[in-house]
Amino acid sequence: MSHLFDPRLPALAASPMLYLYGPERPGLPLAFAPAAALAASGRAETPQKPPYSYIALIAMAIQDAPEQRVTLNGIYQFIMDRFPFYHDNRQGWQNSIRHNLSLNDCFVKVPREKGRPGKGSYWTLDPRCLDMFENGNYRRRKRKPKPGPGAPEAKRPRAETHQRSAEAQPEAGSGAGGSGPAISRLQAAPAGPSPLLDGPSPPAPLHWPGTASPNEDAGDAAQGAAAVAVGQAARTGDGPGSPLRPASRSSPKSSDKSKSFSIDSILAGKQGQKPPSGDELLGGAKPGPGGRLGASLLAASSSLRPPFNASLMLDPHVQGGFYQLGIPFLSYFPLQVPDTVLHFQ
């Protein structure tokens, strides 16, 4: 413990020093060293940079002036007198002082009056910026830029023109003779195969030619004639400019009639009927007066019984297409048509 209180211990060569800066007094060192030690340490160490921005330094110089205005050289002299750090490298920080004076709105340049001695204009503080300095420091505020008078008006015409162009597009589509919506419907329709030309007719149970009674044949023929007449009247009433309608709408009764047969009725009819004659085997349809369109497509000899009968009806309104192809096709007899119907262009 004796070496801690030994008087021969060397004294501290340089004690830590703290400088307090202010606008009214120079740096005041706080230390408990002799004056000689303070002088030696001050020469050896460079002075500390004051914790103030250039804007705060300029504001201090302006407020310290008697008329609250000072020239550029007066600002330089005030800074060098109060803060020893700025004695060196004058060119660097003086450029920064000029830069802040010209770009900051808080500093206002006042021209010198005529006849007043000296040269250079004065710099003063804007009265609206006095509250931006707290304890000598400049408090930056983020000012929201005020929109110009023409900014909102410039945006409104753009929105209005965009809305008008959007409204003009449906009007242009509807004004073209009504063809726009029709074209859009045709384009939006699925490109599926036609039920008349491409797709086969709905399947129906097989019906042997010999099982049909004369009463059933007469009723089926009447229903088929009415269906064909209604279909032709609907197609001719539309006119040449109307779109083609599917002809399958005119034969719902015949399809329902053909679907009404079941396997039990076929088996019961086969047990109660006798084998048909040769005339029924060849045609499957009774010959009528004047000759009729719709001869049997499949012929068989007298010794063989055809498994089914097929009839073909041509549609005069659809070129190259068939009205209906059914296997079997015994729901109605083929109708007698004039020769002009079979004349295709």
Curated annotation (Swiss-Prot):
<dbReference type="GO" id="GO:0000785">
    <property type="term" value="C:chromatin"/>
</dbReference>
<feature type="compositionally biased region" description="Low complexity">
    <location>
        <begin position="188"/>
        <end position="199"/>
    </location>
</feature>
<dbReference type="GO" id="GO:0030154">
    <property type="term" value="P:cell differentiation"/>
</dbReference>
<dbReference type="InterPro" id="IPR050211">
    <property type="entry name" value="FOX_domain-containing"/>
</dbReference>
<dbReference type="GO" id="GO:0000981">
    <property type="term" value="F:DNA-binding transcription factor activity, RNA polymerase II-specific"/>
</dbReference>
<feature type="DNA-binding region" description="Fork-head">
    <location>
        <begin position="48"/>
        <end position="139"/>
    </location>
</feature>
<dbReference type="Pfam" id="PF00250">
    <property type="entry name" value="Forkhead"/>
</dbReference>
<dbReference type="GO" id="GO:0003700">
    <property type="term" value="F:DNA-binding transcription factor activity"/>
</dbReference>
<keyword id="KW-0209">Deafness</keyword>
<dbReference type="GO" id="GO:0003677">
    <property type="term" value="F:DNA binding"/>
</dbReference>
<keyword id="KW-0539">Nucleus</keyword>
<dbReference type="InterPro" id="IPR030456">
    <property type="entry name" value="TF_fork_head_CS_2"/>
</dbReference>
<feature type="compositionally biased region" description="Low complexity">
    <location>
        <begin position="220"/>
        <end position="234"/>
    </location>
</feature>
<dbReference type="GO" id="GO:0030166">
    <property type="term" value="P:proteoglycan biosynthetic process"/>
</dbReference>
<comment type="function">
    <text>Transcription factor required for proper proliferation and differentiation in the gastrointestinal epithelium. Target gene of the hedgehog (Hh) signaling pathway via GLI2 and GLI3 transcription factors.</text>
</comment>
<dbReference type="GO" id="GO:0030111">
    <property type="term" value="P:regulation of Wnt signaling pathway"/>
</dbReference>
<keyword id="KW-0238">DNA-binding</keyword>
<dbReference type="GO" id="GO:0043565">
    <property type="term" value="F:sequence-specific DNA binding"/>
</dbReference>
<protein>
    <recommendedName>
        <fullName>Forkhead box protein L1</fullName>
    </recommendedName>
</protein>
<dbReference type="GO" id="GO:0007495">
    <property type="term" value="P:visceral mesoderm-endoderm interaction involved in midgut development"/>
</dbReference>
<dbReference type="GO" id="GO:0009653">
    <property type="term" value="P:anatomical structure morphogenesis"/>
</dbReference>
<keyword id="KW-0805">Transcription regulation</keyword>
<feature type="region of interest" description="Disordered">
    <location>
        <begin position="136"/>
        <end position="289"/>
    </location>
</feature>
<dbReference type="GO" id="GO:0007507">
    <property type="term" value="P:heart development"/>
</dbReference>
<dbReference type="GO" id="GO:0006357">
    <property type="term" value="P:regulation of transcription by RNA polymerase II"/>
</dbReference>
<dbReference type="GO" id="GO:0005634">
    <property type="term" value="C:nucleus"/>
</dbReference>
<feature type="compositionally biased region" description="Basic and acidic residues">
    <location>
        <begin position="153"/>
        <end position="165"/>
    </location>
</feature>
<feature type="compositionally biased region" description="Low complexity">
    <location>
        <begin position="242"/>
        <end position="253"/>
    </location>
</feature>
<dbReference type="GO" id="GO:0008301">
    <property type="term" value="F:DNA binding, bending"/>
</dbReference>
<dbReference type="GO" id="GO:0061146">
    <property type="term" value="P:Peyer's patch morphogenesis"/>
</dbReference>
<dbReference type="InterPro" id="IPR036390">
    <property type="entry name" value="WH_DNA-bd_sf"/>
</dbReference>
<keyword id="KW-0804">Transcription</keyword>
<dbReference type="InterPro" id="IPR047514">
    <property type="entry name" value="FH_FOXL1"/>
</dbReference>
<keyword id="KW-0225">Disease variant</keyword>
<dbReference type="InterPro" id="IPR036388">
    <property type="entry name" value="WH-like_DNA-bd_sf"/>
</dbReference>
<dbReference type="InterPro" id="IPR018122">
    <property type="entry name" value="TF_fork_head_CS_1"/>
</dbReference>
<dbReference type="GO" id="GO:0000978">
    <property type="term" value="F:RNA polymerase II cis-regulatory region sequence-specific DNA binding"/>
</dbReference>
<dbReference type="InterPro" id="IPR001766">
    <property type="entry name" value="Fork_head_dom"/>
</dbReference>
